[in-house]
Swiss-Prot record:
Record InterPro entries: A/G_cyclase, Adenylyl/Guanylyl_Cyclase_3/4, Nucleotide_cyclase
Database matches in CDD domains: CHD (cd07302)
Protein name, as recorded: Receptor-type adenylate cyclase
PROSITE patterns reported in the protein's UniProt record: GUANYLATE_CYCLASE_2 (PS50125)
Glycosylated residues, chain numbering: N15, N50, N189, N312
Residues at which Mg(2+) binds: D389, D432
Amino acid sequence: GELGQTDRFFVRIINTTVSEAAHTLTSEKEERIVTAVFGIVSEDMLDTPNTTFIDPLRLSPRLNKFRRNVIHLSPTLEQQLFVLASHLQSIGSSKALAVICSEESNDIGDAVRRTLAEFDVPLESVRTRMDGEALDGYLPAGGDVFVIGLSVADVEVIAKKLEKHSALRVIVLFSDVALLYDVFSVAFNGTTGCERLVFATNLPHWSDATPSSVTVQRFHTALSDPKMWTPLSLLAFATGRLMQSILPRMEKVGSDTLANFFYADSSVVVDGMRYGVFDDIECKPAGSDLEVCASNYGATQISVRSMSRTFNASIALLAEPMTPSMRFRDPNEGALTRAQLIGVVVGTIFAVLLLLALGIVLCVALRNTRDNDSAPKEFTDPVTLIFTDIESSTALWAAHPGMMADAVATHHRLIRSLIALYGAYEVKTVGDSFMIACRSAFAAVELARDLQLTLVHHDWGTVAIDESYRKFEEERAVEDSDYAPPTARLDSAVYCKLWNGLRVRAGIHTGLCDIAHDEVTKGYDYYGRTPNLAARTESAANGGQVLVTGATYYSLSVAERARLDATPIGPVPLRGVPEPVEMYQLNAVSGRTFAALRLDRKVDLINDESDATDGVYSECGSTHGELSHSAQTIMMVLCALIGTFTAPQREKLLIPFCERWRVSLPRKTGTAWDENYSREVVRCIALKVGHVINFDSSAYDFDDLPVSMRRQSSFIVLSHQLMESIQETTQQGPSGSDEVARTCV
């Protein structure tokens, strides 16, 4: 930049030769402050100290090596191979070859073999071609051929070969397409072979006359001449837009701080294009609790396309955009050493006997999971009740709707296996909350402890849930200056030992209950002060925390207490309880720390048929809360949707919504599911969903949200007529919510 101008983005073009490029850059740094280098670079330029390279484009194919100061926005060679191999698997490729011209031919060949093996694509051979050697003799008459490393003359050879052999498909790197774009355009435009020249990129179509991409729309506005619409110019434009987006967010711009930005923010979204995740933490050894690998590449949504689409944007993609996981199977997985093989043979007999015995035990135990024999039935005997709930489940469903169904199913399976193991009784399950009854207080405490251990050691197959929890904590820290995130800022090595996957809170209380047998479910239910206190205890806990009341703790023998790691918390005031309750924290996972108890939380007891005298809070009780604007909107939409259905049909429609959103059904005034009751259920759903909508929309301006966040957030789009109707309704005053309720017929 220039003296006194600190709020501008200066770009300087340097013309040099490959041999002089590194020296030219060094000379430039002696005269000017060089923060970053963009565009085409030589290999030795990347070794220049105190310089950050943003999306460097190399003239010769190279595998990516982690350099913290090199940030790749375009797909790396490895990413392209991964996406292209996935495409070949999907079309049933029967024969693949590779022809490589590079100083790293051997290493690139190994990468090709590994990637194709991952997708079970047969690889016939990998051949190395010397620089300057003719390509014609390397191309067969058929099959799928990776040609990695091209010269100007090679393009014409490929065009003629594809025109001559219709069974041949050639796959090239996008960097070669971008660098030799003019040559490709002349050689392939109007030929039939362009349909079988294939490459992969994360760029939208640069010459689409009616683009849907915001990046391309702005690109065309900046460059009105279609002759300038090339891959290289779009790459430069997208990089410039990225810099325009991130530089204002940096207090001080320098080479190191620029690189730090990518690794600190992890992921960046500009004009609908997402880059990341970037990570500068080195890989841990295989088999560690949390595999973390350094990553300086961030291309996402990489699609496979033919050269014919380059000339005609209406031609469909060969493969829809995907973000490669870059995870590979261990080629030695399953292989046994001689000693291991001997051990397996010797232990087979014992293993068979052990499995047989274990199978008998599990069959008996699982048969009793909902067996009423395990239910406490004597009203004169104390019952220990456990309430569990997944922390931030609604937010997790909003962030990961495709993932949470499997995660919650796993959560249910793990809890039920422990219920069977400890001879406990599953009273009921609503959404992701469990109510469990135990005859033994010690069995209940052990069950809750082992639940935390089981969850933290389970292989969830993703780190997305953990990332979301940490993000939620950081967002709360921004809103509340007094809040210190207990896990978000932990070192990864520490975090993976303490936390993993879903976080479940649990509350345990022991006491006498009113016990009733439900003729509909054929199961037992528990009422009175004991379930209320257990529910309130659970509600006060944080995710991953187990709270035990003094009543439960002192129900344990001295020997049983000695086997537990419990920390006294002292008297805790619970909502609706006149006196503070003595509380203990069960340290199931040693080393965990938690935020302050959630004493300001309202309780929604799983037992939705509890007596009103129990004092349990319910949003759908007789004293209705005021419907927010969002809730009124939701209620009107639901009313309009179900208005044409009969009462039994409405029941079938609304029950799944209640289960998914964890909405407790209001108490029935009669026995039938009539129109009035349907209206009450709709109102409960609207209240719950309205809270989420208000929470999501209060923190962000929709227009400012990245596209990826818009897809993950909850929004309702309304017509102008419906909005006017809502506004008229709300202008009627306090009775507006009742008016909305009356329209639900």
